[in-house]
Amino acid sequence: MKKIALLLTAFIGLTALQSCTIEEYYDENYYEGYSQVFELPNETLSTPEDAFTYSGTWNFTTPIYDSDNVLVYRWQGNSWTLVPVSYNLGGGDMIKYDYDFTRYDVKVYVSTSFPINELTNAEYNEFVYRQTFRVVVVPGGFQQKINFSDYNATISALGLENAPLKTLQLKK
């Protein structure tokens, strides 16, 4: 009798669990067309973080996925340079760009190895005043091998050559 009760319980349990399913949302177009590129034109990084660092923060128009990655490029005269990047000003002085991001925004920093208010006018104009950045959102599952240091190769691999540039507004 105990065996029949055990078998009956097992049978009922297996039948009841058959109806349990997990439904996951999968967006077919996620990897095709989700990549985005934003431009931050002529922005002055003017929010002081400390005596050595200024920053600027821009909100994404819509939150990005948790799994996405963000790349930031800085316009350097005639080409795009991948951030983070450092420049030697001479005499042991350095200036560096870096960034961080969340699902909701991207923040770009400019840091110096000395108090930033000691930059010459020429250095301030070259590295802080009216800087242009491009922010590229790369889907987290993107598997193609890309040379991320080359902006044009990155844009080409993501299929964004003809995509319109979206502009983000500086967070005040």
For the regions a language model picked out, list residue spans one by one:
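Bacterial Sec-dependent N-terminal signal peptides
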Residues: 3-5, 14-39
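Basic side chains
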Residues: 2-3, 134
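Intrinsically disordered, low-complexity segments enriched in polar/charged residues with Gly/Pro
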Residues: 1-2, 59
